[in-house]
Amino acid sequence: MRSLALLVILASAFVGTAWAEDPSGIEPQALSERMESGDTELLVLDVRSTAEFDEGHIPGAINIPHDVLGERIAELGPVGERDVVVYCRSGRRAEIALETLKGAGFNRLFHLEGDYLRWSEEGRSVVRPSARP
């Protein structure tokens, strides 16, 4: 009986660890609410190209393209200090970036559900460059 109880405890610990390593999804509404509340434990990371970022991005987001994230990861600050919400245009590059971040030890990771396409389609706030004369 003791060995069964021990097995259940060990299995629970393993499952909990496995779940903690997988990034959670965050809905656009939930991200908006956290941003509006001034949440200082939040970092929004846009992993699209610089050209895409310059065309429009989520307010307060920082841009590190997914293909150079490994080289520039120190720009995100100490591992584990903030929740990192990652997005790209539609999801593929964000998944690659999330794997890079997990490999670097980040564990407070979130993937924006629907990425930038959904965010902008829902009419949420977007920073766009001012029109040039």
Predicted features along the sequence, with ranges:
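Rhodanese-like catalytic fold shared by cysteine-dependent sulfurtransferases
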Residues: R2-A5, S12-L42, T50-D83, R92-P133
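Phosphate-rich cofactor/ligand-interacting catalytic cores and adjacent structured alpha/beta frameworks
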Residues: D46
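Short, surface-exposed ligand- or partner-binding patches at beta-edge/loop junctions that are enriched
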Residues: Y87
